[in-house]
């Protein structure tokens, strides 16, 4: 690093500065400094920090100018997040980037060794307008792997009737069953997990994830709510069985002061495809969003989805607001033949 610069793990007293840094960096890319402050706090010092290793880089005056995180996303996959102060300038940033990315690689490999693995895939998400980060990754051995559509659908009060007006025979959508205190029953949680795991088996960049890993990761989100998880039961030879599921969360208020709903996952089992399960689940989420007085439902979809999901979303009123990109770099631990799990589509 440049002379006088230093690094350390973030502490509670850094949260406000990190929120400001993330907001400034986002504004420099898309013109909006609106961020989820609770998410920044959780990743830095809260529950989401449990599955992340991170470092802040400070200039000679002690100001945080870079925040890097390595998320142990799954066996064989390490998500890397890099937030830099746009005011750094290209010369300083070009000097810092190799050091920070080398740190991320070393941490990811250390975590992999802890899992008994011989390596991992570094995965970084880049906004389509972030040419600065794209250039840094390209110069440090990363390659563009995929493009994702970030879509949003406005919600109107009349949408509460969608599940009734668009009901599909042989498909019933319900929220996961919960006890009086709101805690969900294990059978339904396992059904949601199974539907999502099995439905994403033929999707890009989908890694095997254990049931506890799945639950912990989704519960980390500040907007997590058990009453935002749905199951679509389908009738098969006179019996009702799960055919699909949705895991959603609360979106923070937008510029108009109204919250929304975000669909983290929607999965339809391969044997249930073609029966209107996906649309039935989407109608349930839209109707629930309308009943709660919210104004939008957002989601992410693969630009090259094997199921043509983007076409379904577009036909139901979703529009693409912007795109993000996945940049990858595969790294291995030297001197070991231990396995490196692949994405299921690559197995």
Provide a role label for each language-model segment.
Residues 92-110, 265-268, 274-291, 296, ...:
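Conserved acetyl-CoA-binding loop-helix of GNAT-fold acetyltransferases
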Residues 72-79, 83-178, 325-329:
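Acyl-donor-binding surface of acyltransferase catalytic domains
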Residues 22-116, 126, 242-259:
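Conserved donor-binding loop and adjoining core beta-sheet/short helix segment
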Residues 125-160, 228, 283-347:
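Active-site/acyl-donor-binding loops of N-acyltransferases
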Residues 234, 246-252, 265-270, 277, ...:
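Active-site proximal loops enriched in glycine and acidic residues that flank catalytic Cys/His/Asp
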Residues 86, 203-204, 226, 230, ...:
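Extended hydrophobic-aromatic, low-complexity segments
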Residues 161-261:
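Flexible, substrate/cofactor-facing loop regions flanked by secondary structure
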């Amino acid at each position: 690093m440049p002379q006088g610069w230093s690094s350390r793990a973030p502490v509670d007293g850094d949260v406000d500065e990190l929120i400001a840094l993330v907001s400034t960096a986002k504004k420099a890319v898309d013109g909006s400094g609106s961020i989820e402050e609770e998410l920044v706090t959780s990743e830095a010092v809260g529950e989401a920090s449990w599955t992340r290793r991170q470092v802040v880089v400070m200039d000679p005056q002690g100001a945080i100018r870079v925040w890097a995180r390595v998320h142990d996303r799954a066996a064989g996959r390490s998500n890397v997040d890099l937030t830099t102060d746009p005011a750094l300038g290209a010369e300083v940033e070009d000097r810092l980037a190799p050091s920070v990315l080398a740190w991320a690689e070393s941490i990811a490999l250390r975590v992999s060794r802890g899992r008994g693995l011989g390596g991992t895939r570094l995965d970084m998400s880049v906004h389509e307008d972030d040419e600065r980060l794209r250039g840094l990754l390209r110069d440090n051995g990363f390659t563009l792997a995929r493009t994702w559509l970030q879509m949003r659908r406005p919600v109107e009060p009349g949408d509460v009737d969608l599940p009734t007006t668009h009901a599909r025979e042989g498909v019933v959508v319900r929220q996961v069953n919960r006890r009086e205190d709101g805690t969900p029953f294990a059978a339904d949680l396992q059904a949601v997990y199974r539907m999502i795991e099995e439905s994403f088996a033929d999707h890009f960049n989908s890694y095997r994830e254990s049931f506890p890993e799945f639950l912990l990761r989704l519960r980390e989100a500040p907007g997590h709510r058990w009453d935002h998880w749905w199951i679509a039961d389908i009738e098969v030879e006179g019996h009702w069985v799960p055919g699909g599921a949705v895991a959603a969360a609360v979106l923070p208020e937008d510029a108009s002061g109204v919250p929304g709903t975000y669909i983290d996952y929607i999965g339809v089992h391969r044997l249930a495809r073609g029966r209107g399960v996906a649309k039935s689940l989407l109608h349930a989420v839209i109707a629930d969003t309308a009943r709660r007085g919210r104004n939008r439902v957002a989601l992410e979809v693969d630009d090259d989805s094997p199921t043509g999901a983007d076409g379904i979303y577009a036909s139901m009123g979703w529009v693409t607001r912007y795109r993000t990109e996945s940049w990858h770099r595969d790294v291995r631990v030297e001197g070991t033949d231990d396995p490196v799990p692949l994405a299921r589509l690559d197995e």
